[in-house]
């Protein structure tokens, strides 16, 4: 690393990472797994476009810090998905990167050992190995696209991606979304602004050119064709924004922007007033709107784990409770199972009219 009076003045270390193609060679996908992911992306695109009447449910831990917990959750999730598949299309949240308002644990890729060692290469290996195992279980997977380089390492494994409230306004993330190979949801801003998400969706649908890395790890000029499979995610802001009036306002603004109204409701964050126990009430309110004839709501997002609540990420690993979130608080598996079964029951026989 060149370091002198002008270059890298505030850089203290440099580590060259393995390339995306090296990581993929170590943890490859089979042709059958590739076909499975392509199929699930197609199903999600059909739901967004109104061709598939089912409700898309992106559900799972706020973040992944323990692969064993993730696998246990996945086994339960997979069994439930099969039982509710005629009305709900369940996609498991597998979030490895966490945006922070100030500082804090940034996720499994950045700091897999949760000790400040920032062993990113180990984090990438752990993440890809886990994702391949989850795909092998037959699950479609969801994540938040945060670091612009991560999709080259892991993007082939995901069926859906989100651009978060803190990054939706970022040009870098809009450009990245335009090149992602899966459908993308754009969250409204942390202040509740819908325009932020709508403008991001419009921008990401267009072709872009930007500097990134290729599969060989080389810096390259990348050209995208634009991503037509976008939608808005209502996550609340200074106040919740999932009421019928809020949904109607989002529909109006999307139509004015020349977009087909297509939106998901995040049952956590601002919509739950940051009280994880309110997520079922939010979900039930949204389902009631669908039963009343709403056709623009295509999905729900739920933060769920094996056990409810959360715990500090700064305590020793040996003292952490199994199956409890180290970031946002989540509802328990028992509550998740009951909620999704109830939604399935409520929507069964009511979805045919939603087909565009």
From Swiss-Prot:
Transferase is among the record's keywords: yes
Pathway per the UniProt entry: Metabolic intermediate biosynthesis; chorismate biosynthesis; chorismate from D-erythrose 4-phosphate and phosphoenolpyruvate: step 1/7
Catalytic reactions of this protein: D-erythrose 4-phosphate + phosphoenolpyruvate + H2O = 7-phospho-2-dehydro-3-deoxy-D-arabino-heptonate + phosphate
InterPro entries: Aldolase_TIM (IPR013785), DAHP1/KDSA (IPR006218), DAHP_synth_1 (IPR006219)
GO molecular function: 3-deoxy-7-phosphoheptulonate synthase activity
UniProt-listed GO biological process terms: amino acid biosynthetic process; aromatic amino acid family biosynthetic process; chorismate biosynthetic process
Cellular component terms (Gene Ontology): cytoplasm
Keyword Acetylation: no
Gene3D superfamilies noted in UniProt: Aldolase class I
Top EC class, one word: transferase
EC numbers on record: 2.5.1.54
Pfam families, alphabetized: DAHP_synth_1
Alphabetic keyword roster: Amino-acid biosynthesis, Aromatic amino acid biosynthesis, Transferase
Functional summary from the UniProt entry: Stereospecific condensation of phosphoenolpyruvate (PEP) and D-erythrose-4-phosphate (E4P) giving rise to 3-deoxy-D-arabino-heptulosonate-7-phosphate (DAHP).
Note: There are 3 DAHP synthases, AroF is feedback-inhibited by Tyr. The other 2 DAHP synthases are Phe- and Trp-sensitive, respectively.
Family: Belongs to the class-I DAHP synthase family.
Entry protein name: Phospho-2-dehydro-3-deoxyheptonate aldolase, Tyr-sensitive
Gene name of the record: aroF
